[in-house]
Amino acid sequence: MRYLTAGESHGPSLTAIIEGIPAGLTLHPADIDHELQRRQGGYGRGARMSIETDRVQISSGVRHGKTTGAPITLTVINKDHQKWLDVMAVGDIEETLKLKRRVKHPRPGHADLVGGIKYHFNDLRDALERSSARETTMRVAVGAVAKRILAELGIDMLHHILIFGGITITILYKLSFRELQERALHSELSIVNPKQEEEIKTYIDKIKKEGDTIGGIIETIVQGVPAGLGSYVQWDKKLDAKLAQAVLSINAFKGVEFGVGFDMGFQKGSQVMDEITWTPTQGYGRQTNHLGGFEGGMTTGQPLVVKGVMKPIPTLYKPLMSVDIDSHEPYKATVERSDPTALPAAGVIMENVVATVLAKEILETFSSTTMSELQKAFSDYRAYVKQF
């Protein structure tokens, strides 16, 4: 399985082409639209989300509600493009129109300046448009297809926010997977403690008035993955490493950890390692899950626990100082539309990116020309793991 995305933030559309999806997977536009709507939601989103109503168009690879095994083409139209017809025109335009929305004061924390240097851009909008988080629309669309595969194999997942702009979400007692999932899904903030909703919303409103932004830490949990996915035989086959790369590829993500993560640096080995158990009904298990479901780059059969840290959004309504790329004089950075926070949306993106990596690993590991073939191979493997 592989995919490519294309499109600019204010261009006419965004596109993804996915190759390697088995034939016979039940797939409808509504499956993808559901994830796209989740990405657009959450408290703190800005004006762009009131303009766009993301809906996918499937133009290949699906017929009568089933995948055919051919490449799948997904497209999402950018409604906001109608206001940017001159600025984002494919053909040449008058010089005055070119200068209309030219970006020459790069924003600290964005790809503007370095992208302009790398690709020799006189107008930093050429870097801004593609590096925008709008691109993640299509990674969520691809992830929605991946989640359909995982669901057919009995794999489920969730995400929730652990730290919201410096406020730690308090979890007073251990919640089951289903309890975490339900609470996060019914929260505008993707948090599992409803008593903290108003406190955080008030904080977001305060940050917005100040023209500032906040980040936080997101946790994604995956249930139902058997032991043995990934491999230790080469560095690039380790599944946790693949997930780390994928999570860090999400806009504004600056760190990733598994299980208790960086806290391991403060603990002894006897406190960190997960003791092994075995029962006739369940097979192998672990007393704990400090390592987040991974040993030696492979899944252990425990829930996968992946955490990602998102920096505050770099576009500020009270912009930081920058430099004019023509005169090299100090200037305030360019201001584009922005949100005080996009943590709930980033959680949806992270969840779908993780789903894509897991689906790809499964499709590469098991016979997967058709869904029925994949389901049998996966079921047989589960049975083998249980009786090992």
From Swiss-Prot:
The keyword Phosphoprotein does not apply. One of its GO terms (cellular component) is cytosol. GO terms for biological process: amino acid biosynthetic process; aromatic amino acid family biosynthetic process; chorismate biosynthetic process. It catalyses: 5-O-(1-carboxyvinyl)-3-phosphoshikimate = chorismate + phosphate. NADP(+) binds at R39, R45. FMN binds at R130, S131, S132, N251, A252, G296, K311, P312, I313, P314, T315, R337. Pathway: Metabolic intermediate biosynthesis; chorismate biosynthesis; chorismate from D-erythrose 4-phosphate and phosphoenolpyruvate: step 7/7. Reduced FMN (FMNH(2)). Its cofactor is FMNH2. Keywords: Amino-acid biosynthesis, Aromatic amino acid biosynthesis, FAD, Flavoprotein, FMN, Lyase, NADP. InterPro entries: Chorismate_synth, Chorismate_synth_AroC_sf, Chorismate_synthase_CS. Homotetramer. PANTHER family: CHORISMATE SYNTHASE. This is Chorismate synthase. The gene is aroC.
